[in-house]
Regions:
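Short amphipathic alpha-helix
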Residues: 16-27, 44-45, 308
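A charged, aromatic-enriched C-terminal amphipathic alpha-helix characteristic of glycosyltransferases
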Residues: 15, 159-160, 263-334
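Acidic anion/phosphate-binding donor-loop and adjacent secondary structure
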Residues: 105-110, 130-134, 143-165, 205
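A short, glycine/small-residue-rich beta-strand->loop->alpha-helix junction that serves as a flexible
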Residues: 7-19, 177-179
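Catalytic binding pocket for nucleotide-activated donors in carbohydrate/polymer assembly enzymes
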Residues: 222-287
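A short beta-strand/loop micro-motif in the catalytic core of glycosyltransferases
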Residues: 71-72, 117-126, 217-218
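Short His-centered aromatic/hydrophobic patch
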Residues: 73-79, 99
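A conserved, positively charged/aromatic
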Residues: 106-119, 210-211
Length: 373
């Protein structure tokens, strides 16, 4: 099958990009022909994806949606595609609109294309599902896709006897607040190995091998599911605060907010964070080891994707979709202008940031040359 992912950016290691990338990697591994099209394509993520044999392009308007069996859409990219019945087009295409947040315009539902085309609407949490239904997205079409982890993250034989204190504490964050950075330093003073994976630390894609046994992970969102899959207790805290280690009392509430920390907005200081990370570690390990298999299956990625594939044959015919699109043509053109504006503004934003980084590098070089001696 041919499968298309149309997203805003394929450049940074962020959840909005990594979610479709992981789905594409799985489908590509099954032998499907996958394309990821993004408004902005750049290092470091895009080359990693392209090297696997997945097609990468920044020309979304050059693509015909009806050439694909499944189209996964994010960030108001649907209006940028063409919808043309030509030789080789599919009789049916399943349209999946994925929403991974409700905080920004980019992540909220579209106005015309989405209501007309959506066969499946993805929300990454129960809270986001409620938000989408308040915006008149039909609830029976929403699938909660809780940032599940790919098979490679799941460790079959987790350590049976956890250490009394974590041997390592890994912070995974692109936006860690000061109290977390300070807490990491306090853990280091206790003799615990610490590391920061993110834009202010070591900027790499998180892999299963990075998440070793007998350690703790401090993060929110997608990395929490990674940690759960590895059998490593996640300490849920970031810029929104958070509940800390997962417990019987807070698990479902934290999950309903996608482990973002927005379940409680609890903010504490660095000293308390460090104490909780160290002192609460054994109990956090025991809680994680006791999670029932049925609950853990919720966070396995592959069954969700298989369910999507099974729905392709029941998608509406593209001929019927085309008739509906033609009837709404003036409104669709309006939304296309908006989507082009989003694309151009984002590209300009990225180009401006790149220019600023270049100027800073050149300024540092000039200062070094001008230093006496």
């Amino acid at each position: 099958m041919k499968i298309l992912f149309a997203i805003n950016q394929l450049s940074e290691f962020v959840g909005g990009s990594l979610v479709p990338v992981e789905v594409a990697e799985y489908l590509h591994g099954m032998g499907h022909d996958c394309t990821i099209a993004a408004n902005h394509v750049d290092e470091p993520l895009a080359p990693l994806v392209a090297r696997q044999g997945i097609v990468v392009t920044d020309e979304i308007p050059a693509l015909n949606a009806f050439d694909f069996d499944l189209v996964w859409l994010q960030n108001h990219t649907a209006p940028l595609l063409r919808y043309e019945p030509v030789d080789g087009s599919r009789e049916r295409t399943l349209f999946v609109f994925a929403h991974l947040s409700g905080l920004t315009f980019h992540e909220n539902p579209g106005l015309v294309f989405e209501p007309l085309l959506a066969d499946v609407t993805i929300a990454n949490s129960e809270n986001l599902k409620r938000h989408l239904t308040q915006l008149d997205v039909p609830p029976d079409g929403i699938v909660v896709y809780p940032n599940p982890a790919p098979a490679g993250f799941w460790r079959i034989d987790p350590a049976a006897e956890p250490a009394q204190t974590p041997t390592t504490v890994q912070l995974i964050s692109n936006h860690a607040p000061p109290e977390i950075i300070d807490a990491l330093a306090l853990c280091s003073q206790r003799g615990i190995d610490t590391a920061h994976i993110g834009q202010a630390g070591t900027y790499v894609r998180v892999t299963p091998e990075m998440l070793g046994a007998d350690g703790a992970v401090v993060s929110v969102g997608k990395s929490v599911q990674y940690a759960v899959a590895r059998g490593i207790p996640p300490y849920v805290y970031d810029r929104w605060g958070g509940p800390g280690y997962l417990t019987v009392e807070n698990f479902e509430r934290a999950a309903s907010a996608n482990f973002s920390g927005r379940c409680c907005f609890r903010k504490i200081d660095a000293q308390q964070i460090a104490e909780e990370i160290v002192e609460g570690f054994p109990a956090a390990c025991r809680f994680l080891a006791g999670l029932p298999p049925g609950l853990l299956r919720r966070y396995r990625m592959e069954p969700y994707i298989e369910q999507l594939l099974s729905r392709i044959d029941s998608a509406p015919p593209n001929a019927a979709r085309l008739e509906t699109l033609i009837q709404k043509a003036p409104w669709l053109r309006r939304e296309r202008f908006m989507a082009l504006g989003i694309r151009d503004n984002f590209r300009g934003h990225k180009a401006g940031n790149a220019k600023i980084r270049q100027m800073r590098r050149e300024t540092r070089k000039l200062k070094r040359r001008l230093q006496p001696g």
